[in-house]
Amino acid sequence: MKQNETAAVLMVLMAAACWGANGIFINILTAYGVNGTQMTLVRMASMAILTGIWLAAKTPAALKIDLRDLVWFVPAGALGLFMFGLFYTYSIQLVGMGTAAVLIYLMPSLVMLFSVVFLHEKFTPGKGLCLVLSLLGCALVSGVAGGVTLDAGGVAYGLGAALCYTLQNILLATKLKKYSPMTNLFYMFLFSAVASLVFTAAAGELPGVAYILTTPGALAANLGLGLVCSLAAQWLYTAALKT
């Protein structure tokens, strides 16, 4: 395996570990009485601000994009990233971390399959083996094979999260080589935050957002959710695809 390929595999594994921490932070926030809509808004908005500040301070030129590419960035953020975060949060709350992990880890498999169908990438025996082993491993470690009771809504949210993330990857597949991972992340977080704000306001959930911002424990957990499970995970996975 080439050095670049090894680095990409390691980054995907680290991204998976970051995604796996979702349940820890979500369970803490749930104990504070925070719902998925509220924590998703704080998560996406805070990460948009942080990535924006980072780019403005380090590489301001990276904030410039071709306006024609908004046709890719808007749905990637508003649909792919926002709905992914929202659906995955609800899935964890309804079916628990183990089962939600099985469902969400379908997304690399879906990305691979969609890439073969829509982007005409080669489906090799190695990819097929990785696909089978990843799905089998998720099922074994989650306890699904041991008779876990599944909530239909939680399963639907988990599958929806996997599909949304697949959509995000397909939409950006032709743009990842053009922009840096941080540029992609900033605009995805930005449009995800806008979509989340509209959704949260329409649902009448903004008072809950104010509660998070004024409660140190809830705010710390929400920032951890954003930094580890959104920023770090997304950057690692996006960088791996670029590699």
Language-model segments: residues:
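Glycine-/small-residue-enriched transmembrane alpha-helix faces in small-molecule transporters
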Residues: M1-V42, G147-T174, V194-V198
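Juxtamembrane C-cap of transmembrane helices in multi-pass membrane transport proteins
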Residues: C18-V34, M39, S46, G85-V95, ...
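Specific transmembrane alpha-helical segments of multi-pass solute transporters/efflux pumps
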Residues: G23, G52-G98, I104, L140, ...
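Membrane-interface helix termini and inter-helical loops of multi-pass transporters
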Residues: I24-G36, A62-L63, Q93, V141-G153, ...
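Transmembrane alpha-helices of multi-pass small-molecule transport proteins
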Residues: A31-M83, L110-V111, C164-L171, L185-L206, ...
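Specific alpha-helical transmembrane segments that line the substrate/conduction pathway
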Residues: Q38-I49, L79, G85-K122, A161
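Hydrophobic transmembrane alpha-helices of multi-pass small-molecule transport proteins
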Residues: T51, V74, F114, F123-V144, ...
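Loop-to-transmembrane alpha-helix entry segments
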Residues: L67-R68, I104, V117-L140, V148-V155, ...
